[in-house]
Amino acid sequence: MSGTESSKVYVNVMAEFTKDGRLLPRSFIWKDGQVYEIQRVTDVRRAASLKAGGVGIRYTCIVNGRESHLFYEDNNMWFVEER
């Protein structure tokens, strides 16, 4: 892969439904078993992953002080773009 390509990494996500019906991810488990806490969700929108392919709800999250995108696909699976 070149430096600009990415691939999908499907992850397990701990999420909550708020009382007003929003779905918010709280943490995810990376492929090596490491759990990453999501400090903040800064944006939620329907979008395509231009790096890895796929479409769904894109959550822009702050994880370990860095911005990351977590996608919830229409098939009810979560993925992260591997860097």
Language-model region placement:
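Cysteine-centric segments in proteins
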Residues: 1-83
